[in-house]
């Protein structure tokens, strides 16, 4: 009897096909598929024994490491729903996420125990807490935390979880339009089709049989995949699940270090490298330019999976690593994979963020009609077919993003684009307002709210300014209260208690009055012009920003 397209089932097919193959490597540690199965089963049973029920939410608050893969698989085996927790979040953001997700259990690294201890009194529904040792000494027993391996040791290693459903929910938390995280709800079958390997991205056709990937795994040696970004990103979750379903090997590292990346590729003979645009590509190039004795002959694909990276960096990578393929992929937590641009040695490629979209992705104008190639019209990227159910506990935002137009249901998260004459699509950005800093989305309204909490700030707008490494950096245009002129260092210290560090402004412009519409709506075009007209009045130490 066919098994539903459930993530746990798909992983178990590969486990059965290649039990002795290495599934995951991190540093000097590694697990075979059979060992991963044993530990994930034990975790699943432990969660169930602690009262975690089907569709309960379990947070995962860790950097990349072996235990994060055990936890991902164990959570879905238990029938629970994984909640990805950004380890950069400060306490206010954690409190919101724990509460909004209705989290009942948490797996976290010990280094975050103090933050967790401060948040738990306001989130009493988080009852079961497993702590992964990481060499730090923060006290987790004060709130009932239990060491990860001690907790799962008593769990059953058996795979006896009953039937599963393709309609089970997979939750991807992403920043909302106000900056607050929103949980995007996917059916397991749908996210498998668009993000986790259930579609041949070259042809756009579905993988026909749920056992096909596992059968191919048994018949072929494994590819070695190395996703660099943290697992909090859907892109790295995607790369990891794809590898698990197809019996491949995933290499992880807890931190990004360019030299260590190349050493790891050399050591483990990595075939596919995944990263996030220029923020990672530039240091990787710099490390290669310095010269090395690494054997990188195994590497044939370099893929940017969360932020487009510049043509100059592609050119340099191809120069340093000839005969490789480089790809840019577009997509989002709301759409999954949407399209790609591919560049290999000797191939022509344009200078803009241009991709070829798949046949389930379109660009729609304001009237809901498809934008014609070469028309020069701007439209929004819209995805049909396998798309999310909606946002968790947010009917209003669900109705805004997931719309039915001419009888077709689309996911329209707000990414603007135009269609070129050859059918490729040039990306213009999310509402032309959000800031993409090294692959991290920053939404202006959240930063503005934090800034305006400072007693010396009357009003503020936040925009992105160009940055050679990160693509963009966060800049603030501030109207101070009369007689006040807060320094960037003061504002930095103040807002860090409200927002994660990567959202904090790196440059500051003062104006007599922030320009808004009569209805109070912000004029971001005007704010951007202020940053381009003259040098910043104050910049973060070590970061130089000038007009133009």
From Swiss-Prot:
Q: Which residues form the signal peptide?
A: none
Pathway where this protein functions: Lipid metabolism; fatty acid biosynthesis; Steroid metabolism; cholesterol metabolism
Extract the ranges annotated as region (Disordered): 520-548
- In this chain, ATP is annotated as bound at 174-182, 415, 430, 521
Name the source's superkingdom: Bacteria
Query: What reaction gets catalysed by this protein?
Result: a medium-chain fatty acid + ATP + CoA = a medium-chain fatty acyl-CoA + AMP + diphosphate; a long-chain fatty acid + ATP + CoA = a long-chain fatty acyl-CoA + AMP + diphosphate; (25S)-3-oxocholest-4-en-26-oate + ATP + CoA = (25S)-3-oxocholest-4-en-26-oyl-CoA + AMP + diphosphate; hexanoate + ATP + CoA = hexanoyl-CoA + AMP + diphosphate
Q: Where is the composition biased (Basic and acidic residues)?
A: 520-541
Keyword ATP-binding set for record: yes
The EC number(s) given in the record are 6.2.1.2, 6.2.1.3, 6.2.1.42
Check the record and name the SUPFAM superfamilies matching this protein: Acetyl-CoA synthetase-like
Taken from the UniProt entry, a GO cellular component term is:
peptidoglycan-based cell wall
Keywords on this record?
ATP-binding, Cholesterol metabolism, Fatty acid metabolism, Ligase, Lipid metabolism, Nucleotide-binding, Steroid metabolism, Sterol metabolism
List the InterPro entries.
AMP-bd_C (IPR025110), AMP-bd_C_sf (IPR045851), AMP-binding_CS (IPR020845), AMP-dep_synth/lig_dom (IPR000873), ANL_N_sf (IPR042099), ATP-dep_AMP-bd_enzyme (IPR050237)
Give the enzyme's main class according to its UniProt record, as a single word. ligase
From the Swiss-Prot or TrEMBL record, what is one GO molecular function term? ATP binding
What's one GO BP annotation on this UniProt entry? Actinobacterium-type cell wall biogenesis
Record family assignment? Belongs to the ATP-dependent AMP-binding enzyme family.
What is the recorded function of this protein according to its Swiss-Prot or TrEMBL entry? Catalyzes the activation of medium/long-chain fatty acids as acyl-coenzyme A (acyl-CoA), which are then transferred to the multifunctional polyketide synthase (PKS) type III for further chain extension. Catalyzes the ATP-dependent CoA thioesterification of the sterol 3-oxocholest-4-en-26-oate to yield 3-oxocholest-4-en-26-oyl-CoA. It can also use 3beta-hydroxy-5-cholesten-26-oate.
Q: Please report the name of this protein according to its UniProt entry.
A: Medium/long-chain-fatty-acid--CoA/3-oxocholest-4-en-26-oate--CoA ligase
């Amino acid at each position: 009897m066919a098994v539903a397209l459930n993530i746990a089932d798909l992983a178990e097919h590969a486990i059965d096909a290649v039990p002795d193959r290495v599934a995951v490597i991190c540093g000097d540690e590694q697990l075979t598929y059979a060992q991963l199965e044993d530990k994930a089963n034990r975790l699943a049973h432990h969660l169930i024994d602690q009262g975690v029920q089907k569709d309960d939410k379990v947070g995962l608050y860790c950097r990349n490491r072996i235990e994060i893969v055990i936890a991902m698989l164990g959570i879905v085996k238990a029938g629970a729903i994984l909640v990805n927790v950004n380890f950069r979040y400060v306490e206010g953001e954690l409190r919101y996420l724990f509460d909004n997700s209705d989290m009942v259990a948490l797996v976290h690294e010990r280094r975050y125990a103090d933050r967790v201890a401060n948040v738990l009194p306001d989130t009493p529904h988080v009852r079961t807490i497993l702590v992964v040792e990481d060499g730090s000494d923060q006290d987790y027993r004060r709130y009932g935390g239990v060491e990860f391996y001690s907790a799962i040791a008593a769990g059953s290693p058996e795979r006896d979880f009953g039937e599963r459903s393709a309609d089970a929910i997979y939750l991807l938390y992403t920043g909302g339009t106000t900056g607050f995280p929103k949980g995007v709800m996917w059916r397991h079958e749908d996210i498998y089709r668009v993000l986790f390997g259930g579609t041949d991205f070259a042809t756009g056709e579905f993988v026909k049989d749920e056992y096909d990937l596992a059968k191919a795994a048994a018949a072929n040696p494994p590819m070695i995949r190395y996703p660099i970004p943290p697992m909090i990103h859907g892109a790295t979750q995607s790369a990891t699940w794809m590898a698990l379903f197809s019996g491949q090997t995933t290499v992880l590292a807890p931190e990004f270090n360019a030299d260590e990346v190349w050493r790891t590729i050399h050591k483990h003979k990595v075939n596919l490298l995944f990263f996030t645009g220029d923020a990672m590509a530039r240091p990787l190039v710099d490390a290669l330019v310095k010269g090395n004795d690494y054997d990188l002959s195994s590497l044939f694909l370099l893929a940017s999976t969360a932020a487009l990276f510049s043509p100059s960096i592609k050119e340099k990578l191809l120069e340093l690593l000839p005969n490789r393929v480089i790809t840019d992929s577009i997509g989002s937590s709301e759409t999954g994979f949407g399209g790609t641009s591919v560049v290999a040695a000797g191939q022509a490629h344009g200078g803009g963020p241009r991709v070829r979209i798949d046949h389930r992705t379109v660009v729609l104008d304001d009237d809901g009609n498809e934008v014609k190639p070469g028309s020069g019209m701007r439209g929004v990227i819209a995805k049909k077919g396998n798309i999310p159910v909606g946002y968790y506990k947010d009917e209003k935002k669900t109705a805004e993003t997931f719309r039915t137009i001419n009888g077709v249901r689309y996911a329209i998260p707000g990414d603007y684009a135009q269609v070129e004459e050859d059918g490729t699509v040039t990306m213009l950005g999310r509402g032309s307002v959000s800031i993409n800093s090294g692959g991290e989305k920053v939404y202006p309204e959240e930063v503005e709210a934090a800034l305006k909490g400072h007693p010396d700030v009357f009003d503020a707008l936040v925009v992105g300014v160009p940055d050679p490494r990160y693509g963009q950096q966060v800049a603030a245009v501030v109207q101070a209260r009369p007689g006040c002129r807060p320094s960037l260092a003061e504002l930095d210290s103040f807002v860090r208690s409200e927002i994660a560090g990567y959202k904090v402004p790196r440059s500051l412009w003062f104006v007599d009055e922030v320009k808004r519409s009569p209805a109070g709506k912000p004029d971001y075009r005007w704010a951007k012009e202020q940053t381009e007209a003259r040098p910043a009045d104050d910049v973060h130490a070590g970061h130089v920003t000038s007009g133009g």
